């Protein structure tokens, strides 16, 4: 297969994994587009994206326009004369003129099985909703939000102990292989594009800190899903004794209870059991203000007085 001349557009670490795979392949990455450097850290020093750092280390030209809507930026991209543009978590809207510029158009690596979970947070929403599987879709980009024709899909079962952090890692391994496979199919003309079924489409809204507050009136199963979805960000939490306590790990208990939602049923080294709107949730790992995440056994040693049975955890902001 003849090597393709590729423009790569991406910004975070997830994108950098895909760029690395392209660099390692026989294809030519002729240019990289990434978001402008942003202030980061305590000193608010201007920091390059992971994609830019990788590109610079391989002497690949880097472009960082604030927008691709203006003609000079579009002409600059067209002058690169690329066969295809690969887009992974870039963060800028690509207007139609840009989508139509490369010979084979623009393709995108998306972290869900489309048309389910279009949008910004597909990995987190799959966990939040209790989906049993997720995966990667390579699609031909159009002007809509993740609405383009699907070129290739790979599947990944979601395990009970998966969090957004672990799924991110698994998909960051699966995505590059799927991308290389799709590029081979496109170059050889062996891929058949499949239209998305609009009736099955839904949107993965961005997560918010407000949404991470545990509402004990929900079911234990839903809360267990949320804790996994919001790990590592924004991290589920509840308010108690005037403090915000983060919850990193839970499981659904087999204990039954008629207690009011938010009531502690039992507290032991094995976990703190809390009544919910439906079922009982066992808290296994938590984080007190200013401390590291700890097992419940360690939390009870430090603050056992906060978590005595029949105490009602206050999920309203103080």
Curated annotation (Swiss-Prot):
Keyword Transferase: yes
SUPFAM superfamilies on file: FMT C-terminal domain-like, Formyltransferase
Reaction(s) the record says it catalyses: L-methionyl-tRNA(fMet) + (6R)-10-formyltetrahydrofolate = N-formyl-L-methionyl-tRNA(fMet) + (6S)-5,6,7,8-tetrahydrofolate + H(+)
Molecular function via GO: methionyl-tRNA formyltransferase activity
Key words of the record: Protein biosynthesis, Transferase
Enzyme class, broadest EC rank: transferase
Residue sites binding (6S)-5,6,7,8-tetrahydrofolate per the record: 112-115
GO cellular component: cytosol
Gene3D superfamilies named in the record: Formyl transferase, C-terminal domain, Formyl transferase, N-terminal domain
Enzyme Commission number(s) from the entry: 2.1.2.9
Keyword field contains Protein biosynthesis: yes
Physiological role: Attaches a formyl group to the free amino group of methionyl-tRNA(fMet). The formyl group appears to play a dual role in the initiator identity of N-formylmethionyl-tRNA by promoting its recognition by IF2 and preventing the misappropriation of this tRNA by the elongation apparatus.
Family: Belongs to the Fmt family.
NCBIfam families assigned: fmt (TIGR00460)
Annotated protein name in UniProt: Methionyl-tRNA formyltransferase
Biological source species: Shewanella sp. (strain MR-4)
């Amino acid at each position: 297969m003849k090597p393709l001349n590729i423009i790569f557009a991406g910004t975070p670490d997830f994108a950098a994994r895909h760029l690395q795979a392209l660099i390692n392949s026989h294809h030519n990455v002729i240019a990289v587009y990434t978001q402008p450097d942003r202030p980061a850290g305590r000193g608010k020093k201007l920091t390059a994206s992971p994609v830019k750092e990788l590109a610079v280390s391989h002497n690949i030209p880097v472009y960082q326009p604030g927008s691709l809507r203006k003609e000079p930026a579009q002409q600059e991209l067209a002058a690169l004369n690329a066969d295809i543009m690969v887009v992974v978590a870039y963060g800028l809207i690509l207007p139609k003129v840009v989508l139509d510029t490369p010979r084979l158009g623009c393709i995108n690596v998306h972290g869900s099985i489309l048309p389910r979970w279009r949008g910004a947070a597909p990995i987190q929403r799959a966990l939040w909703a209790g989906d049993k599987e997720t995966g990667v879709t390579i699609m031909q980009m159009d002007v809509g939000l993740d609405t383009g024709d699907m070129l290739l899909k790979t599947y990944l079962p979601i395990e009970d102990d998966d969090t957004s952090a672990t799924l991110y890692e698994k998909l960051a391994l699966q995505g590059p292989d799927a991308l290389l496979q799709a590029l081979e199919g496109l170059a050889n003309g062996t891929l058949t594009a499949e239209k998305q079924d609009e009736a099955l489409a839904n949107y993965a809204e961005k997560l918010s800190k407000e949404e991470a507050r545990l509402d004990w009136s929900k079911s234990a199963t839903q809360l267990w899903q949320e804790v996994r979805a919001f790990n590592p960000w924004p991290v589920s939490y509840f308010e108690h004794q005037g403090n915000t306590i983060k919850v990193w790990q839970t499981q659904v208990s087999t204990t039954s209870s008629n207690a009011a939602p938010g009531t502690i049923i039992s507290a032991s080294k094995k976990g703190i059991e809390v009544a919910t709107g439906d079922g009982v949730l066992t808290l296994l790992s938590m984080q007190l203000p200013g401390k590291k995440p700890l097992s419940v056994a360690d939390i009870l040693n430090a603050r056992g007085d906060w978590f005595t049975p029949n105490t009602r955890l206050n999920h309203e902001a103080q």
